[in-house]
Amino acid sequence: MAKEVRVRYAPSPTGHLHIGGARTALFNYLFARHHGGKMIVRIEDTDIERNVEGGEKSQLENLKWLGIDYDESIDQDGGYGPYRQTERLDIYRKYVNELLEQGHAYKCFCTPEELEREREAQRAAGIAAPQYSGKCRHLTPEQVAELEAQGKPYTIRLKVPEGKTYEFYDLVRGKVVFESKDVGGDWVIVKANGIPTYNFAVVIDDHLMEISHVFRGEEHLSNTPKQLMVYEYFGWEPPQFAHLTLIVNEQRKKLSKRDESIIQFVSQYKELGYLPEAMFNFFALLGWSPEGEEEIFTKDELIRMFDVSRLSKSPSMFDTKKLTWMNNQYIKKLDLDRLVELALPHLVKAGRLPADMTDEQRQWARDLIALYQEQMSYGAEIVPLSELFFKEEIDYEDEARQVLAEEQVPAVLSTFLESVRELEPFTADEIKAAIKAVQKATGQKGKKLFMPIRAAVTGQTHGPELPFAIQLLGKEKVIERLERALQEKF
């Protein structure tokens, strides 16, 4: 590309990083890195009443956690700042005045009540999509001066050209056409409080920051003609647009922040012990697909392969099961030290282990986490997975009860119990040898041998490697559970 690629992700600090925002940020990032360009994070904080405390910090921290190492923002000046819209108000004012002077914009003194009456009258007349009548468009300079002298509040509206067609090429959708009559009439570019509206400020920012490409959600598609009007009035070249398809839930309904069937914020996945590299991989496949069947890719591979022509034109389903599966694939290959960092805090938080562990307790916890590395889908899952190690008395699953009711069980368990009592040291290797001895003594092997022992000491018929699980349970607990299984009637 001849022009340097500069993209932007522009979150509002009215909330934390949502999965939809994360996907948008990621596609901007992949495109920029693929073309050797720059990614800018601009904070669109003009909706002051809705901004939440810590929202800005949370957005940036979660982007960095995901591995989106942007080039310019409020914490990384690149010479195109300020990067907060509330710090750019003087800049917007300059361009608003230019439009007023050129006659492309005007002051509107209509009150909210007058505007509502206008809309109601249009609806009563059968107009489905009411438009602003433009009555303040024709005020004379003298009338404007008089209304201002009376202290009447006003907004500033952009004059919408009549009978004009706006056409642009979208990198996802191809040719898109809008008519000027469909934007709702002359629209507000500056609110009564002096703050510019989104569709005006975003054009000024994108132009001055030399943004070359805009990747954003399809909900912004209807904003595009308004923005093109501003570009045209200033004689500026607009960026190339790519409107990403909706993210839908498993019922194929548009993802709503009120939908409690899906965890929707990146920080929540982080708290649950998901891995950033797995989340990065998953988000990359949410509306984009590489060639072939492979689904696990490193960040560098995704950057190298990213091609806008493979962005989907259909809604993307947020498949929680797939994310959990993908995270498990990453956990299986994870360095044990990092897995311990991920999972151990959850055992402490659940009260399973003390915060100030001894070296012996820490080693035991490390061995426990290693035992479940293949099964664990996310860090917090260690708590339910390992529950049997912390219970005083286990509950037997139905399948375990069926196994323990088999006729060979008393002989297997009593023989194993005798071996366990004498076992020193109580290690996985010694336990393996003891189970082998039970096989020799009872003639039982395979499931008839292992299943009763597993069912008796864990209450389950499936689980981690048995000799290691028995070692971690400890001799005393194993003896208690074997004795109970021999006494209980199944």
Curated annotation (Swiss-Prot):
<keyword id="KW-0479">Metal-binding</keyword>
<dbReference type="GO" id="GO:0004818">
    <property type="term" value="F:glutamate-tRNA ligase activity"/>
</dbReference>
<dbReference type="InterPro" id="IPR045462">
    <property type="entry name" value="aa-tRNA-synth_I_cd-bd"/>
</dbReference>
<keyword id="KW-0436">Ligase</keyword>
<feature type="binding site">
    <location>
        <position position="110"/>
    </location>
    <ligand>
        <name>Zn(2+)</name>
    </ligand>
</feature>
<dbReference type="Pfam" id="PF00749">
    <property type="entry name" value="tRNA-synt_1c"/>
</dbReference>
<dbReference type="GO" id="GO:0005524">
    <property type="term" value="F:ATP binding"/>
</dbReference>
<comment type="similarity">
    <text>Belongs to the class-I aminoacyl-tRNA synthetase family. Glutamate--tRNA ligase type 1 subfamily.</text>
</comment>
<feature type="binding site">
    <location>
        <position position="138"/>
    </location>
    <ligand>
        <name>Zn(2+)</name>
    </ligand>
</feature>
<feature type="short sequence motif" description="'KMSKS' region">
    <location>
        <begin position="254"/>
        <end position="258"/>
    </location>
</feature>
<feature type="binding site">
    <location>
        <position position="257"/>
    </location>
    <ligand>
        <name>ATP</name>
    </ligand>
</feature>
<dbReference type="InterPro" id="IPR049940">
    <property type="entry name" value="GluQ/Sye"/>
</dbReference>
<dbReference type="InterPro" id="IPR000924">
    <property type="entry name" value="Glu/Gln-tRNA-synth"/>
</dbReference>
<keyword id="KW-0547">Nucleotide-binding</keyword>
<dbReference type="InterPro" id="IPR001412">
    <property type="entry name" value="aa-tRNA-synth_I_CS"/>
</dbReference>
<dbReference type="InterPro" id="IPR020751">
    <property type="entry name" value="aa-tRNA-synth_I_codon-bd_sub2"/>
</dbReference>
<dbReference type="InterPro" id="IPR008925">
    <property type="entry name" value="aa_tRNA-synth_I_cd-bd_sf"/>
</dbReference>
<keyword id="KW-0963">Cytoplasm</keyword>
<protein>
    <recommendedName>
        <fullName>Glutamate--tRNA ligase</fullName>
        <ecNumber>6.1.1.17</ecNumber>
    </recommendedName>
</protein>
<dbReference type="InterPro" id="IPR020058">
    <property type="entry name" value="Glu/Gln-tRNA-synth_Ib_cat-dom"/>
</dbReference>
<dbReference type="GO" id="GO:0000049">
    <property type="term" value="F:tRNA binding"/>
</dbReference>
<comment type="function">
    <text>Catalyzes the attachment of glutamate to tRNA(Glu) in a two-step reaction: glutamate is first activated by ATP to form Glu-AMP and then transferred to the acceptor end of tRNA(Glu).</text>
</comment>
<dbReference type="InterPro" id="IPR004527">
    <property type="entry name" value="Glu-tRNA-ligase_bac/mito"/>
</dbReference>
<dbReference type="GO" id="GO:0008270">
    <property type="term" value="F:zinc ion binding"/>
</dbReference>
<dbReference type="InterPro" id="IPR014729">
    <property type="entry name" value="Rossmann-like_a/b/a_fold"/>
</dbReference>
<keyword id="KW-0030">Aminoacyl-tRNA synthetase</keyword>
<feature type="binding site">
    <location>
        <position position="136"/>
    </location>
    <ligand>
        <name>Zn(2+)</name>
    </ligand>
</feature>
<comment type="subunit">
    <text>Monomer.</text>
</comment>
<keyword id="KW-0067">ATP-binding</keyword>
<keyword id="KW-0648">Protein biosynthesis</keyword>
<dbReference type="Pfam" id="PF19269">
    <property type="entry name" value="Anticodon_2"/>
</dbReference>
<dbReference type="InterPro" id="IPR033910">
    <property type="entry name" value="GluRS_core"/>
</dbReference>
<feature type="short sequence motif" description="'HIGH' region">
    <location>
        <begin position="11"/>
        <end position="21"/>
    </location>
</feature>
<keyword id="KW-0862">Zinc</keyword>
<feature type="binding site">
    <location>
        <position position="108"/>
    </location>
    <ligand>
        <name>Zn(2+)</name>
    </ligand>
</feature>
<dbReference type="GO" id="GO:0006424">
    <property type="term" value="P:glutamyl-tRNA aminoacylation"/>
</dbReference>
<dbReference type="GO" id="GO:0005829">
    <property type="term" value="C:cytosol"/>
</dbReference>
